[in-house]
């Protein structure tokens, strides 16, 4: 759905050359044009408008002096740096333009009618006057000469196997005689010059020749290969014209055919068979086709037509039409009308071989024109809902308009057509936000037709409905009407005949103001014209556009774009300069466009598409070259962009990687766009979408989510880009347009949680608005069913940073319950009968489904059927519930209501067999109420409720209750049901205590026994756990004798010593057994020096100090010294070995020997197909979900795992084992501080100063050694490696592998804690200053 838009015009008038031009050729490397006349050659530079060279062929005798000579071909030879010229008299001349030397390389006596070079310039073909073809090499060595007329079909002759012949086919009403009719051959067309026509395929492997057959007088097309072997001959085609052009891509050969009532362009295949056609918009014998020309990329077919003289008074015209194909339909995109009189008559034209869309035209009066076109999509530019998203496609004298807001029809179909008396060349839409549907059309007669959307009193005959029309259908579409046709008058009318496309880049900026650009024919300058409508009271249908003002620009303007919001107009020159045109200024100033830094903007390469857009707070120029390079101002942000469009605050682009990317420009910057579009950047979320190969953007429907793409063949595809969808939904939600948002989300499968998560407070405050707008029970139920606790604005649809969703977060409470309760309250207040099913859904959807309430409501419906017409019956409600809840679960909950009518109602709707549930229900009905409910609760495994009902059944049922309590561990719940003074309470307490004893929870068991009066069992429990204080309390309650207390005390002391509670054991011995001597010995054994001295002095046994206390202190000091020496030696040895191991690993890594990963439980980390944790580890570590895992057991497990590290030299994880050992040494030494402090005090007290200083010095040296070594052992590099987040929810096997390779270490993840250095607390007081 693209049009050809005139890019620029290069014009060189009145070239000073002798005679009349006859043909021309291009010198692409020099950028010059070679023109041949009856006198010789002339080389001109159309850019500088200078004559470079002039070579006379008359002086050398190659052309006659009387001017009757003719040049039939000119070809620039790149590798020979010369020009080859063929004359009609038969001479082939090689001309060097640099030296102006002429060399006749060959001569044909019968004359030459055609000279045609192969595309690779390796071969040249000459058609002679004797109807022969001569093929020569590029060095003009003859290869072969053959007759141009051949009797044979060619090497590709079709093979007939006997069936399927014409004689055996059905011929309809003509009968069998049609099979035997003689083929009637029509002679060549009257205006045919009978000259042969030659065309080459793009790769130079074949060429085709069109000649008039001497036998039949009709034209035939023959195909030859590069070896000059005839391949095929075309089938007989009546009225075949002389024009011939082989499509460069090699698929088809174009020619013309005159039919009884029309004139067609027909296409031949290489085998000579016809393959498709299209009809020219002329009557029979109205025009003749002089030539057909394909452009370099085979996308445009130029048709050179000339009027046939019918009336002497009429002035014949010459026309050049440009045709393109899309979706198997041929479009007439441009029509250039020249006069055949005087200097404006076309002599020759050709496409540029390098620039595909550049057409060169040579006119009779030494007038040269070069037109550059580019593809453009003409679409309306509004950004509000009133814009219909119109796209206009030029097709001859029709403009096909498709309204994408209401209809999406594939081309060549359209919504409606605009009909014109002349072919259309340009279409432009009004750059006004509120009137963007109005359009203006410039046709080949330089008339501008203005169409406006609005009320029209009568049907417009120039507007014809397309795909939306039909008999008996009501058209719900606003079609435009022709407001007026304006004629543009030029100061020099001759200019229009010489250059039919005088005005280009037509832009409609205001309702009565047009901008257009023309180019100077004498210098590289451009002029911007202001076209304003002249007031005309006489003629309402026709008017005139006056050039109210003009502004000259030094340079060739190649693009002009306008921002409909800011009204900024930007010009682009051929050299890439960007200017801002102040069209509203009286002086019509033109100044350079500057970026935010104040520097002029200049595109590095000319851009064929330019747009204006606001990026952040800056208005920028966006440009796309024909080489897919995309620029923002003068910064190239991408080089793989195939199309782009600016809509509101979004920039949409399609890329060569078959993706469509959408960026929000509001908060974007050049760097973010460049990073997002770079090939190495991986886009996520709503930015990127995969599209079909070769897709291009057609338009974006404003205030909607539709993005229209066109495929290379021409068919359309409508996609809803996630970024556009979410942006539009957020706008609707901000405006409380819940219905529009809901319908869009439901259709495009957007998670409905976004309605709430976008702004929870606003939603909860407008629940009534939401329900009234949706107004559908099914839709509300759908919303309920999709609710989940997840915040989709953080997971699925992250909102822009500036979105209000970050300013208003979730209210306190459970999301699902909040929404369900809020909506249910509103629905019950509006119409509880209408929204009955939704109310039931709100109960079911809650975090803890309220099925009992739901069943109760259904039961109420059964008993009291509402009279409201919107109400649902109990049967319908129950049937709906069975879709939400499993029938067995619903049956169980109905049973839990103890309402047998409700149970029967649910059971009848289920698939249960009545033989299964009726006997059970009948049995229940016969039971006493409490025991019945107990039985139901036990059946439903609601044991807490069951024992509550059973406790009310009487003492005779207590044994059954106690057994259930023991089986289901319901002791705490059961104790709440009985009075503490009751026997049942005591029995349950004893059973509870025994249960705790079995679970090795001895202290709670003792407390439970003591509470219920079971003192003997309580004493046993306290003895087992070592709670000597409670044990003595229970002993007092049991009235123990003195001997019993002594025995109990010694037993307790023994258990406490086993638990290394020496102080507690000493206290028990002192109080119960009055054995203070044994108590002192226990205290000395436990290093409780001060407590031991207290007892010595309390009982005045100073002799014990000399006999026991002092020796114990000195022995302890020696032990501490030996321990410190051992720790210091171990620490130094491990540290030294660790440095050696690390150095060896670094050397191995540098040598590339660390590729193999150590075998072990983490080896699966490095496999692309394995999980992070191996199976055995998973089994051993995560299979305890049904058991109690204490912090201590987890710690012990980790400790056991670390012990797998071996300190054996050379082991794979030796460095980890050394780190583990060093950390353990440091921690053990740190834990000695308190013990050292206490022994230092008693050493000083008993005047053992030397031993105290020795111990204090040794401990201080050990701590300093370890503190100095910590940074060397636990280096920063190893800590960072361990802190790197290798694993996580977004990690993959490849990312984990890459992370580990970057770390250059094979450290298992489970041992990352080993890289955290142990802490040495300097604030801990251990040193005794008295010993300094």
Swiss-Prot record:
GO biological process, alphabetically ordered: regulation of translation; tRNA wobble base 5-methoxycarbonylmethyl-2-thiouridinylation; tRNA wobble uridine modification
Region (Mediates dimerization): 885-1332
Substitution effect: residue 1011 to A: Disruption of dimer formation, reduced protein stability and reduced interaction with ELP2 and ELP3. Does not affect binding to tRNA
GO cellular component: cytoplasm; cytosol; elongator holoenzyme complex; nucleus
Keywords for this protein: Cytoplasm, Disease variant, Neurodegeneration, Neuropathy, Nucleus, Phosphoprotein, tRNA processing
Signal sequence, start to end: none
Residue span of region Disordered: 1150-1208
Disease linked to the protein: Neuropathy, hereditary sensory and autonomic, 3: A form of hereditary sensory and autonomic neuropathy, a genetically and clinically heterogeneous group of disorders characterized by degeneration of dorsal root and autonomic ganglion cells, and by sensory and/or autonomic abnormalities. HSAN3 patients manifest a variety of symptoms such as alacrima, decreased taste, decreased sensitivity to pain and temperature, vasomotor instability, hypoactive or absent deep tendon reflexes, vomiting crises, and gastrointestinal dysfunction.
Functional description taken from the UniProt entry: Component of the elongator complex which is required for multiple tRNA modifications, including mcm5U (5-methoxycarbonylmethyl uridine), mcm5s2U (5-methoxycarbonylmethyl-2-thiouridine), and ncm5U (5-carbamoylmethyl uridine). The elongator complex catalyzes the formation of carboxymethyluridine in the wobble base at position 34 in tRNAs. Regulates the migration and branching of projection neurons in the developing cerebral cortex, through a process depending on alpha-tubulin acetylation. ELP1 binds to tRNA, mediating interaction of the elongator complex with tRNA.
Protein family (similarity comment): Belongs to the ELP1/IKA1 family.
Protein's recorded name: Elongator complex protein 1
Lineage per the UniProt record: Eukaryota, Metazoa, Chordata, Craniata, Vertebrata
